[in-house]
Amino acid sequence: MEISSRSGIMILFATIAVCTLVLFPLLQYVAERDPQLSAYDDDWNDISNFRKGLENSEDSNYNVSAVLSNPGVLDEISDPSSTLFVIVGTESPYSSLELEILARYMESGGSILVFGDYDYSNTIAELFAIEFVKHRLWDQNYRDNLSLIPTTAIVDGESYNILLNEPVAIRDLGSQYVNLWSQGFEWNKQIFISTSKNSWIDSDDDGLITPEDEVSGPQGFAVGMRCEMKSPEGNQLGTAVFVSDSSLPINMMWNEDRNSDFLLKLIESMIGTEGEVLFDESRHTQESFGASLFQSALGFYFLLAGDTLITQV
């Protein structure tokens, strides 16, 4: 029996309704977990306030966008020197090819800003012979509970009181494990955030101070490090900045102390008051229905908003 066009349309809408009301909630329920640390979602553990702060600042003019698939598009940027690639919480490792692209991008003058801790951020940090120490960092100078550590960040000579949430230490490895740089490129490391002298790394993960733990010296442990790149000719190139607390820019922490002022000033110190800011959204999706749906919805957001979408398939 043939189905009329009218009946076909009714069946189509009925199918869509069933999928929307029944199948989608079920599939969403079995997804591993919701995406987090996204610049385009408004949950407490996302970073949309960070993005909005950059977009709405009266003191700057940034074009803010996102990379949805992989950093390969960095090879196509026409002016890397005015571009900042922001990575918050690396939930999947960068491949060797992606690291080579990041190295070329920085050799061309591009900058990166990495917020990491217990994740895969070391895949990038090792390019600069540093690492995120994946043991709990304790400090006797804490606030309210042991997880919240107040400290001071120095940006362009100005001090900012900031509040960290379960940071880890950054260790200088001295020698390089991963070298993808062209010959002659150099960088200068500078610590701009550190803990108090009364801090220690819980090396045995028992929550106590024991002989096995690493106690800080008078300078505390580094939790913020800046790497300034120089060409073989000595010309200043891009900057790589590492902050060992992926929760610092999340919405819940945005208004704590001077966190928001610090983050906006940090961006300005890297690319000035104008330029491109690209959030790497490719590290916040998984191979699941819920993650795929989130990424598709994010693509529709750019399409409907008329914003520039930077993506690589």
Where are these regions (language model features)?
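Short, surface-exposed patches at the edges or C-terminal ends of soluble domains, predominantly
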Residues: 1-313
